[in-house]
Amino acid sequence: TASGVFKLGEVTNLIKESKWPTAGPQGFQVANSCRFNDGSSDSLTRSLGASETSTQKGTFSYWIKRSTLSTNQITISNEVANDNERGYIQFNTSDNFRMVDENGIVLATNAVYRDTSAWYHFVIALDSTLGTTTDRVKLYVNGVRETSFQSSSYFNNGFPNQNINFDILTGGQTNKNHIGKIHSSGSDLDAYLAEFVYIDGTQNAVTDFGEFNSQTGIWVPKVVTGLTFGNNGFYLPFTNSGALGEDFSGEDNDFSVNNLTSLDQSTDTCSTN
């Protein structure tokens, strides 16, 4: 109205006609994160199952808030026993995202990630069977596909050959996943992690893990419990302070904790910050 005062009946009618401003969907509210401190070499470790769903297809999704910059820091790595082959995802000393798989990937973004007050969402979706080389590794940051990578002397400019078996997806009872460190010592993570997911056997769409809030335009998390995780898949929401490595995927792929305690459970998450 001209006076700026609306009568109750007018407001009701405007709501019915979808003309009254209302709060947009807020997305899934993440309760907890896990704090990794490089000073105490915090990490999570799990022996992989003997039979993975696939060594050619898989998807990693996680939210991360960095604490320290300009050092090599491993987010996740796979230790392949009795062999020097391995795969890992990291930030390098220049704060680029970097993925290395010794069966055929060396990719580093041109973008840098240096905002220690921000939560970043990374999705790394793999499928080596695809005909288009650059589709075999799809990287998304906050819902947007990243396509600008540093020049590489490796074949395919750092992208894998078709139909390779990714080391980072390889199972076996003597193989191990490490979150927060490389399979050997060093390059420890100094950051908060939330909603850490691995899907064994599928190159998932980024929209399986997040969505843009229709009112704010901000990328927010989605519920992932309805996804199919595969034999070695896992979902770590970090909601059990007494067992921060507990897997909630239904696959019982729990991680053992190394130097992490209940004090490392945090309420600083991608939903609150």
Model segments located where?
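Short, aromatic/His-centered strand-loop micro-motif at the edge of beta-sheets
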Residues: 99-121
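Beta-strand-rich, repetitive solenoid scaffolds
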Residues: 36-37, 77-79, 87-92, 98-102, ...
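Short tryptophan-centered beta-strand motifs in secreted/extracellular beta-sheet-rich domains
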Residues: 62, 117-128, 139
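Extended recognition patches within non-cytosolic domains
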Residues: 1-32, 39-40, 131-133, 138, ...
